[in-house]
């Protein structure tokens, strides 16, 4: 109830102040503002943080997000990929998965004593972007138990691959999903035998709405099997907003559908900016999905 009241109030006050959580691009496409809807998870004190008390919880979240790329791309913003503000672990470096599996093996089982600094030491150099920036990561642990000082030892985890959705209830469904996943992995840790090697499939398949939807439905099925009554229909607005339909038509029983897809826009190397506050990207390419039904193979 508190989350509902606060989130709804925030959106209402923004609307009254003539602020919007959506915008339209030059070509008329309806999109998000680009503002982050980052979720910071933790406890009232570092000692209360579930990620310091149970580091296997963080391991479960990272591994589950890696197994289901739809969680990385469905809720993110316009800029995705290895040079974005929240790259996946397997987007940053090709060899990171092998090292991540070694890091996971260093996290003791549930019930054993775990020093609070251990999580930072084993994951700090892996949860980064291609330049080694620890802040630009899908799972940011800068404020978990950093050796830099007390301001970095708050027991907080920041999930950055979320853009501000246009409606308060869309944000609330995201929050509900995260809270349910934490409850699920607290009771039953997610420990795959081996992390998936997606390779080029990551951007060949999961940039398309068809594969994102199929993968996310698998997530919903697994949540239901774990005792959390989620429905994929709750996230239908997220799909329509993330992958708007351009149009469809039918010819002699054959149906065509054209829908927006995702495209990683990489940072350009020849464009500089004073102070480094601006990073130019190559947005010259866009991807679309063409889906055909009723055609003979």
What annotation goes with each model-predicted range?
Residues 1-33, 44-297:
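C-terminal accessory/tail domains of diverse enzymes
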Residues 36-41:
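A short beta-strand motif that forms the metal-chelation/ATP-contact edge
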